[in-house]
UniProtKB/Swiss-Prot annotation:
Annotated protein name in UniProt: Chromosomal replication initiator protein DnaA
Gene from which this protein is expressed: dnaA
Phylogenetic classification of the source organism: Bacteria, Pseudomonadati, Chlorobiota, Chlorobiia, Chlorobiales
HAMAP family found in the cross-reference section: DnaA_bact (MF_00377)
A Gene Ontology biological process term: DNA replication initiation
Source organism of this protein record: Chlorobaculum tepidum (strain ATCC 49652 / DSM 12025 / NBRC 103806 / TLS) (Chlorobium tepidum)
Record flagged with keyword Cytoplasm: yes
Region (Domain II): 105-152
Amino acid sequence: MSDTIQQEAPDNLQVTPTHGRSFAEKVWSACLGLIQENINTLAFKTWFLPIRPLSFSGSELTIEVPSQFFYEWIEENYSVHVKQALRQVIGPEAKLMYSIVIDKSQGQPVTIELPHQIDAAPAERSVRPEAPGQKASAERERLEIARPRFESNLNPKYTFSTLVRGDCNSLAFAASKSIAQNPGQNAFNPLVIYGGVGLGKTHMMQAIGNSVLENRITDAVLYVSSEKFAIDFVNAIQNGNIQEFSAFYRNIDVLIIDDIQFFAGKEKTQEEIFHIFNTLHQSNKQIILSADRPIKEIKGIEDRLISRFNWGLSTDIQAPDYETRKAIIQSKLKQSGVSLDPVVIEFIATNVTSNVRELEGCIVKLLAAHSLDNQEIDLQFAKSTLKDIIRYNTKQLTLETIEKAVCSYFSITSNDLKGKSKKKEIAVGRQIAMYLSKDMTDSSLKTIGLHFGGRDHSTVIHALNTIEKKIAASNEERKKIEELRKRIEIMSM
């Protein structure tokens, strides 16, 4: 619950019967409709959408604004429009109360009432602590009211739950989680995340914003690309709305700007960013930025901006390693409610190594192709469907490749496989390696025997017969051989 200042508008309004809180929303909504007709769209979104109607009693409407500055700006620039709207909706005797948020700390709220006259001398303040039980009641009342928000521009799918953490992004992930819990009140301000295309920078930044909104820390969260910021800035200058543009950004609590390298060479835009940055940072507002390279490597950015961008934490996101790529694929499949053969997952994770976006693109294409012809998504289907994305050179399959695959599968060493040990897992692995070598290559029995420890051809024949019998007698054994065969095919690509 926040401490508030309440200030009374000097309007002469008619007293009407008391209505419930929901009626306050209807009254304010009607007022907004009239106000919107008389001011431009940017001003309306900036200064009126964040206002919350709190109560309506008699002829008095109480609204909440985010800050003292917010209140003063409305009164200095839009008081005529507000007054006209109130009189049309409520009547000539309407009254307006402003509830101004001045503190978000915990504790018992204190309400201070002042006359709503900007040019008047400050009135004597009367402090009225809430009575026991009123705090919880007031909080419940506020939760029941629809809470207008800034248009955050966040993708609701970009959350921490859909973001895979790995060695490639561990520091950025940890810092982002910390910021989401306490934006602006940490050592990571600004947070700068840099890295190549498609590595998850945008997902990471928007996950912070979505978490802040979900936990109702603040509604004033904005994601914007550097390109859109620059375009809006130019439009604001051309349309004479630069004051409103600047004021809008100075009232953001969590500002997220993507791809700041595009500010390079734009002197006027950098000037505006500089002042916005200073205002937000001094007010402990959170700033989150991304770039395609380290800040110091971006040419055409002013030194004073580079210095400020380095005040907090700058961390990179790298290309995901093999295990992280598998986890990303599995996460995407889980979100889609689909399962895939592990061999297909391994095939994609092995061959798509550049970025997360390509991995997700492979899954989307596979599922789309599957939905069209309802074919089973096996390895061959995956190869055929993804041939335009995954380009690989098929290498000649060697006995060494088979040896590595078998050793990995049975968790044994090459020396074990070629040695004299008769331990069951080693002996079985050796026989399977010989069987697959004969089945998948053109090597002779003699060559196979020599490769696996200098054994003669009769030993190889015995191994072939043994494995063939096991395959015929056991589905489990057949599946084991088939899985190994697929692994070897992937390794040979």
